[in-house]
């Protein structure tokens, strides 16, 4: 399962998925996708467009979508039990998802890590606890 939260993550995710499919065309990869990931062999469970917003009004308006996406992805982790959870940036959302995956013993790879120095130093402890590879 792969989760992105913004356009730049979508571009990185699309390159990552393409590279994986070159190694193993039979892989099933699913999660949150933007337009670029949707053009790859990727099963989009939720659109990144519903998660993003630039201003306060958009963020407040998207709160319901963010909550729906989080619940959907938690259920997906529980039901489908992916071999790996791949996270790309979007730290406030993705670290919570990493914590849940870890409780299910699903390995977590943070492919594009959050910027620790710019935001919260306490994130280092969360990452150390919930992320297997970075």
Q: Which stretches of residues belong to each language-model region?
A:
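Active-site and donor-binding regions of nucleotide-sugar-utilizing enzymes
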Residues: 1-133
